[in-house]
Design a protein with these regions (language model features):
Chain B
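Polytopic transmembrane helical bundles with strong interfacial aromatic enrichment
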Residues: 1-368, 390-401, 451, 455-460, ...
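Helix-loop junctions on the outward
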Residues: 71-88, 414-435
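Structural signature of hydrophobic alpha-helical transmembrane segments
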Residues: 96-105, 372-379, 439-445, 500-507
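Short, flexible domain-boundary/linker segments around small modular repeats
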Residues: 353-368, 381, 404-411, 419-434, ...
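Short, solvent-exposed interaction modules
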Residues: 427-456, 504-514, 518
């Protein structure tokens, strides 16, 4: 009887521990410069990611993956007037890039995403 | 990093669900004590002992909140420190860490300071209520409202009202059930019942008013309800809320009869309240899952239309012929990688890396594979429902129906994830890193557990009353799991169309579990009716599975 009760409690604990899953995005990327799968000319470029909710800019991250697969963490400009944006700058050469972003919404939810884009030779 | 963030999201929803349960029970218990039991305790037989029991429950709830919130905050802090590379002192200044710390402190104060002495002193009682209020304020800081771009103040008040309503009603029910269990005096039951009815009505009013406002601001229009994951989850919450209202109405009629001094089915009220706790906690886990998806109003593209839902659900004959494993996208990709590697004379990489965060590739044969799985699962579940009904009608041999669950579990274990052993190349242990594979395996474990328990109970191998309750509890928990289970499908629309089928399955699972609970716990006509309801729910689940389409 006692063993059975312990087993019931254990089963319920296991079941409760898996009772919920949901790894979907919370902060939604509404707009960006560069656009996803878009193209832009080489040179010093402004990077802007605009979300649906306020973002903790100091605790979010932008990592630029260059065509040679090297990774650079971009410095995010804190701007209280644009609380839903992650802004930065980068010097880009022609090739295929991916911007890995991780945003901490002000309500504590972490969201990550990738932004692939192409840099063309400057005209 | 991808695996860490995915695992973080997985665990954080679980912990958030536990936080909501503990928080609601703590606040509900506190309000129950301050506004119901303490004022009535001198009028009730053994009022002091009853108060002591509810005090203990509330203190345990506060301890639970302390631990759950500590774990949730620690997990978030760890995830942030390791992915962004910030020091602990910096991360602890993030708003979620501040509100988490505030909730931990409040829970600790209530766990340590709530006792008969503090409850008896008006100043101390008010201070405890203030600590409860601070908990609620801190909790609203981790809701969608805090991060919204517009209408922050209004939405924060509304979120607070919603949580207050849930606490005073659903969070108060465990205290109510505890009192019902130990109070046998008719007049006392009438007093407690009618006062708790009034508190519940206040809770329902708060939930209803705040819920309507949140629907306006977070969902916006009808398509937001059926066309987005957020809307579908809110619809499921509304369905369960309506079920709670029906049960609450049943209990209200009992308290009214008691108040008028007439005979009333008090045991039914207790059993209904137990079911209310179960459904209420399921709603809390749905709410925890809801906080991890963006509000419907923010999703302007990738919404599902009614036409797409109608096309997807057009009647078609179930698929009982499986495609060949070699025709699946993952197998074909592996063949291609092997060929390329052989050409370059190097080791071939695996077509899929568990836990990489990348959804596996899919083609038409993968869809046929998944539909075949669902349709055969539907056959199993229809048979289970039919045999359970036959058994209910007195056919003796049909009592072995739970063994079908073991066959179903074996079938799912082999076929759910074709990229994993025994059919695929992926190692059994390495596949645990994949969140979806882990969920499937835990579902299988759950099915085995409730199959074994129910068969042992029905064949007399287990005679304990508690053992009989394992089946309904695990079925209800399985329904809750399914409600918040998501599929890793790259196409957002396809993913939602799958969720649209799984949500009614989950609700039928929750209904099946709790009606079987009532059959076991409620003697008389109510229990007999419930005895026919749950096999009918299983039949419904089976039919929905047979109807299931992924394209």
């Amino acid at each position: 009887m006692r063993r059975c009760r312990r087993f019931v409690i254990l089963s319920l604990a296991v079941a409760a521990a898996v009772a919920s899953v949901g790894a979907s995005a919370h902060a939604v990327l509404l707009d960006s410069t560069p656009k996803a799968h878009g193209a832009l000319p080489a040179g010093h470029t402004q990077v802007v990611l605009k979300y649906n909710s306020k973002i903790d800019q100091a605790r979010s991250r932008l990592v630029l993956v260059a065509p040679d697969h090297s990774e650079t963490t971009l410095a995010i400009t804190a701007d209280g007037d644009k609380p839903n944006e992650l802004d930065s700058t980068a010097d880009l050469k022609p090739g295929n890039y991916t911007l890995h972003w991780q945003a901490l919404a002000l309500d504590g939810h972490l969201t990550r995403g990738d932004l692939p884009f192409t840099v063309t030779a400057a005209p | 990093m991808a695996l860490l963030v995915d695992l973080f999201a997985y665990l954080s929803v679980i912990l958030h669900g536990l936080v909501i349960v503990a928080q609601s029970m703590m606040l509900g218990g506190l309000l129950f004590l301050c506004f119901l039991l303490h004022p009535l305790s001198s009028l009730l037989p053994d009022g002091g002992a009853l108060e002591q029991r509810v005090l203990r429950l509330t203190r345990w709830s506060a301890a639970g909140l302390f631990l759950a919130e500590l774990a949730a905050t620690a997990l978030q802090v760890t995830a942030l420190m390791s992915t962004v590379g910030l020091p602990f002192s910096n991360v602890m200044q993030a708003s979620f860490a501040l509100s988490g710390s505030a909730k931990i402190a409040c829970a600790l104060v209530i766990a340590l300071c709530l006792n008969r002495r503090t409850l008896a002193r008006p100043v101390a009682r008010t201070a405890l209520l203030l600590v409860g209020f601070l908990t609620l304020v801190a909790a609203t800081m981790t809701t969608h409202a805090f991060a919204r771009m517009d209408h922050n103040a209004l939405l924060l008040v509304v979120a607070g009202l919603h949580q207050f309503g849930a606490a005073i009603w659903i969070g108060g029910i465990p205290s109510f059930v505890l009192v019902l269990r130990h109070l046998h005096d008719g007049q006392g039951l009438a007093q407690v019942g009618s006062r708790f009815s009034r508190m519940s009505m206040l809770g329902v009013a708060c939930i209803l008013a705040s819920g309507v406002i949140m629907c306006v601001f977070y969902i916006g229009d009808a398509q937001g309800f059926y066309g987005t994951a957020y809307g579908v989850m809110v619809s499921a919450k509304i369905a369960m809320f309506l079920a709670l209202l029906v049960l609450g109405l049943g209990n209200f009629t009992v308290t009214e009869r008691l108040r008028q001094g007439r005979d009333a089915p008090v045991l039914r009220m207790r059993r209904f309240a137990e079911v209310e706790i179960g459904i209420g906690f399921t709603i809390f886990f749905a709410a925890a899952s809801l906080t991890s998806v963006p509000p419907a109003i923010d999703l302007t593209s990738d919404r599902v239309t009614l036409h797409e839902i109608a096309v997807r659900n057009a009647p078609a004959w179930p698929r009982f012929h499986s495609p060949d494993h070699d025709a699946l996208a993952i197998s074909q990709l592996q063949v291609q990688l092997d060929r390329e590697a052989a050409h370059m004379q190097m080791a071939a990489p695996a077509a899929t890396v568990p836990g990489s965060g990348e959804p596996p590739p899919r083609n038409a044969q993968d869809i046929a594979w998944s539909e075949y799985n669902h349709h055969w699962a539907g056959v199993f579940v229809v048979l289970i429902g039919l045999l359970a009904l036959l058994n209910r009608a007195g056919v003796g041999w049909a009592r072995h129906w739970p063994l079908l669950f073991l066959l179903l579990a074996g079938f799912l274990l082999v076929r759910s994830d074709p990229e994993v052993w025994p059919l695929g190349q992926e190692n059994w242990w390495a596949a645990w890193r994949d969140v979806e594979v882990t969920q499937h395996r835990l579902f299988v474990l759950l099915i085995i557990l409730f199959g074994v328990f129910e068969w042992s109970v029905r064949t007399g191998r287990l005679r304990s009353e508690r053992a009989a309750l394992v089946f309904p509890l695990l079925v209800a928990v399985g329904g809750a799991m399914l409600l918040t289970h998501n599929h890793q499908i790259a196409n957002v629309k396809d993913q939602l169309l799958v969720e649209l089928t799984h949500t009614p399955l989950a609700l039928a699972g929750v209904a099946a579990g709790w009606s079987r609970w009532l059959e076991l716990r409620l003697p008389g006509r109510g229990g007999r009716i419930a005895g026919y309801v749950w096999p009918a729910c299983f039949l419904l689940i089976g039919l929905i599975l047979l109807w299931y389409r992924e394209a």
